[in-house]
Amino acid sequence: VKALFFDRFGGPEVLRYGALPDQALDAGSVLVETSAVGLNFADIYRRQGVYLLEGKAPWIGGYEGVGRIVAVGTGVDRWRIGQRVGFLDVPRAHAARVCAPADRLVALPDDVDDRTAAALLLQGVTAQYLVEDSGRLAAGDQVLVQAASGGVGRLLTQMAAALGAEVHALASTPSKREQARSNGASAVYGYDDWVAQVRRATGDGVDVVYDSIGTTLHDSLAALRPGGRVVIFGKAGGTPPAIDPLSLMEQSKGVVGGDLWTYLNRAESRQSRADRLFAALRAGMITAPVITTFPLSEGAVAHRLLEDRNFAGKIVLIPDGLR
């Protein structure tokens, strides 16, 4: 199978494109011929060796994609050859063919094209669980979204605003702050003295802070009102600092960890979350990102672009020959 792979950790230069042995089709799995696969920051962290990878080199990155089923393993009843499917938690996705456990596939609506689905599934369902499960947002809540112009942050802002929450957004540049405002943020801030600005704007702080940076955990807690909570779901800036539990007790503040795989644990859950995500897109509650495509063989170029913090939008890799 043609794939984008690496056999050592490092920068984009370690990525190679070529043929690797086909993966065996296990019982309970299907073989998907991909038409579009998403590129996410987690793929960069895996390439760098920051995130743990199973098995031995060579490793194929990617977790999210869209395609059609070309083979069905024994014990699979729900899916058939030729069916169009998506997935958001299937490893080794950056390849022309992917072996996927049958319970990790989702059926896709006809009105959402392959590239949009591949661009939206993982980040969209992530934002969805952060709003519904970890944050448990309600209309009238005041929330702060860090990195609000990023892939998840953009959707978080849109979903929270559609729910009726008052969204305060952090973004690093004037253009990104303008993007956050256009996505529904009521107030936007840069990263200079943002805690004081948020507290002045809200009176005594926000109800929920979505922290994807990690190193900002102490500041996130300081931006909360008494009884508020930080949902920490990333460490883009580095490892979060230690916190004293007694400091949380004094104002009844809390820190909630956010990890998608806690909630994405059943086939029915995957499908219902995907259905609700695409319904939100159809209703205009959220919008698809600006999509930049590269051939799978140019994956190293795509990785370099994604690592550029000035990049906005979503990168989708297209198997060679399908552009």
Give names to the regions the model predicted.
Residues 84, 142, 166, 228-229, ...:
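Short glycine-centered segments of the SAM/dcSAM-binding site in methyltransferase folds
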Residues 216-286, 318-323:
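Glycine-rich phosphate-binding loop and adjacent beta-alpha segment
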Residues 21-39, 50-92:
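Glycine-rich beta-strand-centered segment in the early N-terminal region that forms part
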Residues 93-96, 171-179, 240-245:
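Short, glycine/polar-rich helix-capping loops at beta-to-alpha or helix-loop-helix junctions
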